[in-house]
């Protein structure tokens, strides 16, 4: 007896909504607080998930019927994820030397130094890892809270501005970081655990983020056979799973696959 919000389960609600739209129905939609876990959870989180699920459902219905439906919020379509552009770690100054030794042992090279921040770019194949040891700002706060860990993930999509517009329409929280002169303002939203999710594309200046924001060191990689990032796995509290499932599935062009 599994009760969850639209977009969190497997029931074809968009098909039901398509049939409902064909009748000309333009009334209200409502959600019941379905299960005891929702009732015992954060009222704010459940309310946000419920609101987001209805926004997604109406958008999905409009796309399937090929016209606007009452209540649908105009937004760009879900974005296919083309690649992981970089993975950013918040690292303390004390732990940074050991982290750098680990990266070198894995065949990574320090390919760039940020033009204005205590941030380095490490590279091997198509894998880019950013080490951020800034003494203030988002990464510093994240490191204090979580320790040395991944603080941001950058995904390449066809249109970064369209992705951030869809994210905003779906009630995701935009993040505005400090941007120095001549540096890129990379669109981002808050993600799991307070981390950041950046959007990049290859059709705008954002596609040159590495050369714009970093000075090349010329250091060559001692290649260890690592070529790219083939998947991303995130750990969370059991109670958060449905929230973040909806976050990703409503924002991106995704499909569910059986777990191993």
Provide a role label for each language-model segment.
Residues 33, 116, 179-180:
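Residue-level "edge-of-site" marker
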Residues 38-50, 117-134:
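Accessory recognition modules or surfaces
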Residues 1-75:
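Histidine-acidic metal/acid-base catalytic patches
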Residues 56, 66-112, 123-176, 183, ...:
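Glyoxalase I/VOC metalloenzyme domain signal
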């Amino acid at each position: 007896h599994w009760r969850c919000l639209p977009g969190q389960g497997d029931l074809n609600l968009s098909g039901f909504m398509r049939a409902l739209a064909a009748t000309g129905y333009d009334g209200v939609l409502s959600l019941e607080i379905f299960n005891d876990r929702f009732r015992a959870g954060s009222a704010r989180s459940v309310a946000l998930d419920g609101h987001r699920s209805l926004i997604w459902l109406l958008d999905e219905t409009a796309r399937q019927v090929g016209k606007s439906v009452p209540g649908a919020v105009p937004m760009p379509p879900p974005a296919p994820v083309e690649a992981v552009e970089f993975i950013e770690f918040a690292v303390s100054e004390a732990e940074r030397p050991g982290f750098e030794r680990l990266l070198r042992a894995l065949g990574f090279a320090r390919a760039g130094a940020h033009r204005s921040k205590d941030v380095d770019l490490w590279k091997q194949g198509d894998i880019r890892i950013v080490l951020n040891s800034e003494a203030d700002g988002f990464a510093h706060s994240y490191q204090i809270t979580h320790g040395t860990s991944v603080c941001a993930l950058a995904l390449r999509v066809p249109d970064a501005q369209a992705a951030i517009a869809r994210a905003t329409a779906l009630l995701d929280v935009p993040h505005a970081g400090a941007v120095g002169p001549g540096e890129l303002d990379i669109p981002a939203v808050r993600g799991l655990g307070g981390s950041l999710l950046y959007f990049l594309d290859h059709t705008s200046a954002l596609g040159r983020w590495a050369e714009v924001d970093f000075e090349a060191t010329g250091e060559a990689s001692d290649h260890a056979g690592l070529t790219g990032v083939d998947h991303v796995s995130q750990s969370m509290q059991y109670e958060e799973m449905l929230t973040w499932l909806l976050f990703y599935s409503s924002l991106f062009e995704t499909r569910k696959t059986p777990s191993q």
